[in-house]
């Protein structure tokens, strides 16, 4: 089953369901990509920081291109610029490393992963003696100008943002000659992001949801927090429609025209996650899922300081999650 697409302002078509690769083991991700392509996925979401772009590149080389499973022009590949590479001099070398690792000549979409910059260098998480992060003063508007040059060179087809708030999006738009096409943020029924989605849609940005199933497999999960996949409303709709809870959560997003990048390395789940285009929710069913919103954010980078878990970057002036949206 092929995923339906949304049209970006660049004219590109982005499939509404893509394969996420965050937390996918290098040893497992190659087979996962190959399987996903074989069952109709045409959108792969990557990032330099995930540490597995080389293996993804091997899968793409074997399966994408003339005479192979998928022609390159049918595939939509996203990657992301890491925080240590925001300095304008570091942007193109970072992209070229990603392209070399993925064995691609261009990316369909390149995102700035976070609004703030870490200290330049090869350590992905440069730290002070007390364990806190060492930041760099480069502003995302300077980074954006360097990203725009990549489009002019034909290395990237579209640019976007990840983990930016509404104010920061407008700040980028105020200087952009290449406007961002996509915002990628955490989004699921517990964190519906309605205001942020409306803000983006009014400005011609499409939204991609990461952790659309609630990311209950992450290492720092609080055992007390609610589990989206076990939410009674979700289970009831799954039973009613003869679907899995994951399919219910993904259908809710694609019906709102929000693209999703569920991560899996399990063939049965990879297949299940794209089988969400042959059923529809009524307006009442959509409202039931909308009503689950509690502005509950799961993905907040944390640090342990003096034995306590604290948000790693919350004190940074460009931290995105201190604003209402």
UniProtKB/Swiss-Prot annotation:
This is Aldo-keto reductase family 1 member A1. It is found in: Cytoplasm, Cytosol; Apical cell membrane. It comes from the Eukaryota. The keyword Ubl conjugation does not apply. GO terms for cellular component: apical plasma membrane; cytosol; synapse. GO terms for molecular function: aldose reductase (NADPH) activity; allyl-alcohol dehydrogenase activity; glucuronolactone reductase activity; glycerol dehydrogenase (NADP+) activity; L-glucuronate reductase activity; methylglyoxal reductase (NADPH) (acetol producing) activity; S-nitrosoglutathione reductase (NADH) activity; S-nitrosoglutathione reductase (NADPH) activity. The modification N6-acetyllysine is found at residue 127. The keyword RNA-binding does not apply. Keywords: Acetylation, Cell membrane, Cytoplasm, Lipid metabolism, Membrane, NADP, Oxidoreductase, Phosphoprotein. Monomer. Its EC number is 1.1.1.2, 1.1.1.372, 1.1.1.54, 1.1.1.19. Its main location: cytoplasm. NADP(+) binds at residues 11-22, 45, 162-163, 211, 213, 215-216, 263-266, 269, 273. The gene is AKR1A1. Catalyzes the NADPH-dependent reduction of a wide variety of carbonyl-containing compounds to their corresponding alcohols. Displays enzymatic activity towards endogenous metabolites such as aromatic and aliphatic aldehydes, ketones, monosaccharides and bile acids, with a preference for negatively charged substrates, such as glucuronate and succinic semialdehyde. Plays an important role in ascorbic acid biosynthesis by catalyzing the reduction of D-glucuronic acid and D-glucurono-gamma-lactone. Functions as a detoxifiying enzyme by reducing a range of toxic aldehydes. One of its GO terms (biological process) is cellular detoxification of aldehyde. Belongs to the aldo/keto reductase family. The modification Phosphoserine is found at residues 4, 38, 211.
């Amino acid at each position: 089953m092929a995923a339906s697409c949304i049209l970006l302002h660049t004219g590109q078509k982005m499939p509404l369901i893509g394969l996420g690769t965050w937390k996918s083991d290098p040893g497992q991700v190659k087979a996962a990509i190959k399987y996903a392509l074989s069952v109709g996925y045409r959108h792969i979401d990557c990032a330099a920081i995930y540490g597995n772009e080389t293996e993804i590149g091997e899968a793409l080389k074997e399966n994408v291109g003339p005479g192979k499973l998928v022609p390159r022009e049918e595939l939509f590949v996203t990657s992301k610029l890491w925080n240590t590479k925001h300095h304008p001099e570091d942007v193109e070398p970072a992209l070229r490393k990603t392209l070399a690792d993925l064995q691609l000549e261009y990316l369909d979409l390149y995102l700035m992963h976070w609004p703030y910059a870490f200290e330049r260098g090869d350590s992905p998480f440069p730290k002070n003696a007390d364990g806190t992060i060492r930041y760099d003063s480069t502003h995302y508007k300077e980074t954006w100008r360097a990203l725009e040059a990549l489009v002019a060179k034909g290395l990237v087809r579209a640019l976007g943002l990840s983990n930016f708030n509404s104010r920061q999006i407008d700040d980028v738009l105020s200087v952009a000659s290449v406007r961002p096409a996509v915002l990628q943020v955490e989004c699921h029924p517990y964190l519906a992001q309605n205001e942020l989605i409306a803000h983006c849609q009014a400005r011609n940005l499409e939204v991609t949801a990461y952790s659309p199933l609630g990311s209950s497999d992450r290492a720092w999960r609080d055992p007390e927090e609610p589990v989206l996949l076990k939410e009674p409303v979700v289970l009831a709709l799954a039973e009613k429609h003869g679907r899995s809870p994951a399919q219910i959560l993904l259908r809710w997003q694609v019906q709102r025209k929000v693209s999703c990048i569920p991560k899996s390395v399990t063939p049965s789940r990879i297949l299940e996650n794209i089988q969400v285009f042959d059923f529809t929710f009524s307006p009442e069913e959509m409202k039931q899922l909308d009503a689950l919103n509690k502005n509950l954010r799961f993905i907040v980078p944390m640090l342990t300081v003096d034995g306590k878990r604290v948000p790693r970057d919350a004190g940074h002036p460009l931290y995105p999650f201190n604003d209402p949206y």
